[in-house]
Swiss-Prot record:
Start-end of each WD repeat: 9-49, 52-89, 210-242, 243-283, 317-356
Protein name: ASTRA-associated protein 1
UniProt gene name: ASA1
UniProt similarity note: Belongs to the WD repeat ASA1 family.
Subcellular location: Nucleus
Length: 356
């Protein structure tokens, strides 16, 4: 892998990188202060910068063609450009993300207990309904009960990660447990009598346990990804688990698997806490702080802790400019968008692009 370019405008740790769902030439990045920057990947400069939240942004997604963000300031927001059109209070006592399913279902840590789950439905006219409240996954697994609403102090610790694979919602916990849940959304039952009157019976949504794995126990889950339609997970140790049958365990070179990126369903790109990235035989190392035993420590060494990774895949180049500017834009865009690019965020606020 070779370095292509670096994006620099954040002054705080990068917490999320999200390719724009509406433009292949744009990119969203977020940091630990709640700042979001929309980038033009051709000019490699910010297009829009706004203070979306007052604390770390944990998630970025899309719902009904609008940007959705989730922060440790206990809010989930939906945006029309930089205007917030909907705000949902949430519990962000942990560092878990949120997940959007079927473009209208939102899975979040529960507002009552961040160790549990809430399920919401958001319609295209921005009506909010809580379908399932404070579901305790631990009880669901241990008791084998299918239920709609329950709360308890018995659990697997805080929720660390949520990830969707083939309509199964995987939840990774502080304990190291991973639970796969299927969301059942029954259709209303319509009954008719002889007078042509209709009775509509709404059935309650349910979460059903489809998978449970404890290989990572007692180490917290810190990364989840998809590989060949199968869940892949990493923890604070040097172990990556591919959740196929039978389960495959891969020992890696370092502890702290911060990020796992699926590359073309052929290989995994692994990013570690210490800033190192590994892909096949390729290794990228970044400087990290060193502990010294004397008073003349070199404090000038830059901290390059890796915080986030995502893959930018080639897309068709589009341009709205004309003349020489259009030609220049197409040439630069072609260089970016015909190459698989790994975008890596670091604690110092930089985003580095590597050619894969």
């Amino acid at each position: 892998m070779s370095q292509q370019f670096t994006l620099r405008s954040h002054n705080s740790s990068i917490t999320f990188i999200y390719p724009s769902p509406t433009s292949s030439l744009h990119l969203y990045t977020a940091d630990s202060t709640g700042l979001i920057i929309e980038w033009d990947l051709i000019t490699r400069r910010p297009v829009i910068t706004w203070q979306a939240h007052n604390d770390t942004i944990l998630s970025m997604s899309t719902i009904h063609n609008h940007l959705l963000t989730h922060s440790r300031d206990n809010t989930i927001k939906i945006w029309n450009n930089t205007d917030c059109i909907m705000e949902i209070p949430c519990n962000s006592l942990n560092f878990s993300n949120v997940v959007v399913v079927h473009d209208e279902i939102l899975i979040t840590p529960a507002s009552i207990n961040s160790n549990n789950l809430d399920v919401y439905k958001i319609t295209s006219d921005w009506q909010l309904t809580r379908l399932i409240s404070d579901i305790n996954v631990y009880q669901l697994v241990e008791k084998g009960i299918q239920f709609e609403e329950i709360g308890s102090r018995n659990d697997y610790g805080i929720i660390m990660k949520i990830h969707l694979v083939d309509n199964i919602i995987y939840v990774g916990f502080e304990s190291g447990d991973i639970v796969g849940l299927e969301l059942i959304l029954p259709k209303p039952i319509v009954k008719e009598n002889s007078n042509i009157d209709k009775l509509i019976i709404n059935q309650s949504p349910k979460l059903i346990v489809k998978y449970h794995n404890s290989i990572h126990v007692p180490n917290p889950i810190i990364s989840m990804s998809t590989f060949q339609d199968i869940l892949v997970s990493g923890s604070t140790t040097n172990k990556i688990v591919i959740h196929k049958h039978p389960v495959e365990i891969i020992k890696v070179t370092h502890s702290g698997v911060q990020s796992i990126v699926n590359y073309k369903n052929e290989n995994l790109i692994i990013g570690f806490w210490n800033g190192e990235i590994r892909y096949d035989e390729n290794v990228i190392k970044r400087d990290v702080p060193m502990i010294q035993n004397n008073d003349n420590d070199d404090r000038s060494k830059s901290i390059k802790k890796l915080t986030f990774m995502t893959l930018l895949v080639p897309q068709k180049v589009e341009s709205t400019t004309t003349g020489k500017n259009k030609y220049s834009q197409l040439i630069r865009g072609k260089k970016i968008l015909t190459t698989d690019t790994l975008l890596v965020g670091y604690e110092d606020g930089s985003i580095v692009a590597y050619k894969v």
